[in-house]
UniProtKB/Swiss-Prot annotation:
<keyword id="KW-0574">Periplasm</keyword>
<feature type="binding site" description="axial binding residue">
    <location>
        <position position="157"/>
    </location>
    <ligand>
        <name>heme c 2</name>
    </ligand>
</feature>
<keyword id="KW-0408">Iron</keyword>
<dbReference type="GO" id="GO:0042279">
    <property type="term" value="F:nitrite reductase (cytochrome, ammonia-forming) activity"/>
</dbReference>
<dbReference type="Pfam" id="PF02335">
    <property type="entry name" value="Cytochrom_C552"/>
</dbReference>
<dbReference type="InterPro" id="IPR003321">
    <property type="entry name" value="Cyt_c552"/>
</dbReference>
<feature type="binding site">
    <location>
        <position position="250"/>
    </location>
    <ligand>
        <name>Ca(2+)</name>
    </ligand>
</feature>
<dbReference type="GO" id="GO:0020037">
    <property type="term" value="F:heme binding"/>
</dbReference>
<feature type="binding site" description="axial binding residue">
    <location>
        <position position="382"/>
    </location>
    <ligand>
        <name>heme c 4</name>
    </ligand>
</feature>
<feature type="binding site" description="axial binding residue">
    <location>
        <position position="199"/>
    </location>
    <ligand>
        <name>heme c 3</name>
    </ligand>
</feature>
<feature type="binding site">
    <location>
        <position position="202"/>
    </location>
    <ligand>
        <name>substrate</name>
    </ligand>
</feature>
<dbReference type="GO" id="GO:0005509">
    <property type="term" value="F:calcium ion binding"/>
</dbReference>
<comment type="pathway">
    <text>Nitrogen metabolism; nitrate reduction (assimilation).</text>
</comment>
<feature type="binding site" description="axial binding residue">
    <location>
        <position position="87"/>
    </location>
    <ligand>
        <name>heme c 3</name>
    </ligand>
</feature>
<feature type="binding site" description="covalent">
    <location>
        <position position="153"/>
    </location>
    <ligand>
        <name>heme c 2</name>
    </ligand>
</feature>
<feature type="binding site">
    <location>
        <position position="202"/>
    </location>
    <ligand>
        <name>Ca(2+)</name>
    </ligand>
</feature>
<feature type="binding site" description="covalent">
    <location>
        <position position="118"/>
    </location>
    <ligand>
        <name>heme</name>
    </ligand>
</feature>
Amino acid sequence: MMKKMTGKSFALSALVAASFMAAGAMASDKTEPRNEVYKDKFKNQYNSWHDTAKSEELVDALEQDPNMVILWAGYPFAKDYKAPRGHMYAVTDVRNTLRTGAPKDAEDGPLPMACWSCKSPDVPRLIEEQGEDGYFKGKWAKGGPEVTNAIGCGDCHDKGSPKLRISRPYVDRALDAIGTPFSKASKQDKESMVCAQCHVEYYFEKTEDKKGFVKFPWDMGVTVEKMEVYYDSIQFSDWTHALSKAPMLKAQHPEYETWKMGIHGMNNVSCVDCHMPKVTSADGKKFTDHKVGNPFDRFEETCATCHSQTKEFLVGVTNERKAKVKEMKLKAEEQLVKAHFEAEAAWKAGATEEEMKPILTDIRHSQWRWDLAIASHGVAAHAPDEALRILGTSVNKAADARVKLAQLLGKKGITDPVAVPDISTKAKAQAVLGMDMKQLVEEKEAFKKNILPKWDEEAKKREATYK
């Protein structure tokens, strides 16, 4: 049920909004968040960036693979997970996903402010205005009226200049941690580092002094094993699994880390080389195409600059690698789904925390490795061998968990196989978890109808004060 807003709370909301408006009038001199400001000065780049809006299709990844609903039980990704679209949709899609809930005010909702961090040049603007302490404080809804410009110019470039930059302080700290400071990097390296501001694994800190801050788990290295050791060393978990009660890790989108492990990364072929090639405009000018997308769509400007093989041949090789990765992915999922249900059965049979601890550690490590491999959307092209290696270790660790579970269940008198319910569709899997999807969708639609227009109106008024 919706809470009625009292006069006191309404006044407080108005005060918060007014303070945001005042802050907007003092926008940072380092970041211009409005992409359209550059549409004349950098016409070709702007128009090609705007073309990312042509990736209109929304692909429901949970519908394609309902196993993931069970693997993310108790976490927002079990509600909604769609394949990524172009940069133009960054703000739209994070607003619309069921994962962000249906907040009714700036202090409501399931997710923190940090969930805006990869979505907009308004993020560096806010960090510059408020500091990281101010930006990261509070709920995701707090940023609704502030973060309205999609991923664009100010995320990767100095204000009004083609010069590349890191616009988020936590990224500079991460690059320093692995001994590759941006300030000392070559232009070629910088072309990938700017992408690493978002296309990476990250987590939200839980320490009192930096609660909610974004951090990359690179202190011990960027391989799946080293990040795993780091997370274990600080006893971090993203959530507790609803079935197995395992302390879980949710991988994000570690394209930078997996790219470094593949043939392109090891030969320093940058993200820009393949995804933002140099092209020629209608008036004969060379420019960097900002329609970030599949290299095969611009084969002559991307792959063909290095490869002598035909497009058809390389597409075939890539599809073959995708099929192998998918096959191993599904094997890992099959083992993990069974492990979660078997762990649930063990708890119900009276298993103790001491008995379950090594089992839950195996489940945690197995799913972390599965997730890191599949969350990197281009891994079959970037690092197929590494993906298969990681998924192989995931299968092994899930099998280790299941062997221990079989022994434990036997001690508890359960010798028959633990039944896995029908999870053949997204809806059936969500029903198994007791998720009221109808209510979640209705709440989201009300949010989109009642709250989003207010956010946009506040943003419009704030930006009208910009010079």
